């Protein structure tokens, strides 16, 4: 995506056509950002020389997450008329970029998927409208779980053992690469440690 096209779609005031400059929608909200982050054990694959596998696993999560939201958006991501009738659209307009580390410099590969607040209506009258962003929020947890299931499947296909990971509070609902110890993950979790320390300094916990 060129800088010009990005500015046209995500710029202030609402999306413009990246080629003609025509205003497609008027909106104060340019879109929504999805951050799709690999489990720390997947990040460690890049550290031990298996970056290709790491990226294949991450691709599976990103693709499955976006595909789910794409289907939801195609089926009824637009609203038509005062009754806000759910309307079929041509799907998502989005840009994706992958970062390799956390702000603290730890291995923390993650995707930023920027979904534009604009959809092409497939009703008889056609045209472009602002997206029904509430629909995306309603389906975000489902999209996350589908993405995680896809990565688990891909990891097994690549020959890795996996194990459930409920996280420290028991609600994470994730999985991890088996055989990569907690001590390794903690070594490369400086950002998480900084956040925990800041929260504890306020007299609360995470």
Per-region residue spans from a language model:
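Intrinsically disordered, flexible peripheral segments
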Residues: 1-206
């Amino acid at each position: 995506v060129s800088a010009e096209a990005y500015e046209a779609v995500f710029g202030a005031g609402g999306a413009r056509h990246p080629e003609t400059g025509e205003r497609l929608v008027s909106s104060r909200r340019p879109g929504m950002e999805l951050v799709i982050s690999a489990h720390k054990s997947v990040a460690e694959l890049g550290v031990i020389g298996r970056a290709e596998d790491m990226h294949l696993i991450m691709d599976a999560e990103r693709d499955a997450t976006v595909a789910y939201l794409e289907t939801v958006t195609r089926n009824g991501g637009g609203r038509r008329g005062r009754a806000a009738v759910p309307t079929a659209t041509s799907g998502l307009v989005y840009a994706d970029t992958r970062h390799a580390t956390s702000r603290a410099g730890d291995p923390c590969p993650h995707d930023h998927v920027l979904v534009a607040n604009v959809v092409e209506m497939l009703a008889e009258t056609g045209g472009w409208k602002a997206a029904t962003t509430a629909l995306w929020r309603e389906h975000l947890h489902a999209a996350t779980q589908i993405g995680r299931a896809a990565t688990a499947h891909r990891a097994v296909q690549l020959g890795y053992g996996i194990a459930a990971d409920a996280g420290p509070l028991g609600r994470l609902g994730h999985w991890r690469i088996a055989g990569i110890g907690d001590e390794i993950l903690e070594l490369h979790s400086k950002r998480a440690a900084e956040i925990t320390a800041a929260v504890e300094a306020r007299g609360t916990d995470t």
